[in-house]
Amino acid sequence: NNSMLGGEILSGEISYKGYGEDFLFKNSKSDFKATLNLNNINLDYHKDWPPIDNLAAEVIINNDELVANIISGYIFNAKIDNTSIIVRNLSQNNHHVLINTEIYSHTNDAKNFIVQSPLKNISTIDQLTKNIIGNIDINLNLDIPLDSEEIEFGGLVFFDKASIESGIPE
């Protein structure tokens, strides 16, 4: 599975303390850490979700956990910043990607994201966003299981200079 479609590794650091035969997850006393500073990454993280473009991030793998601190990136024209991504228990199956993010954008980008993701199957979201036009500030928490259709999410959406169209003819 190639989720990183392109970009640069600006710097990297790897350390491992333990026996070679225990590498990577075979002995809890082993200690593995890798840190990568990435830039201009195009990330297709899941086939059902829109990709992230021009991503700049610090990625840390510390033993059995991956943490990505997103500095900047874009989904469509929506700017992503102040984002953390965590994948725990890398050595096990049934991975969950936990995402906490803040995105400031226009409702058109939010609508495109919804239409091109599993969120389109949640009628409440469609109804809430259908007639709203303007800028939005999204604080979102997602739990995306990589081998399941169930998605858990929560968060806040703030509207800035937005309007609601009634759909009533003039």
Language-model features, listed with the residues they occupy:
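Extended amphipathic, helix-rich lipid-handling scaffolds
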Residues: N1-N27, T35-N39, L43, N89-E152, ...
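Short "repeat-start/strand-capping" segments in structured domains, especially the N-termini
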Residues: K29-D31, D53-N54
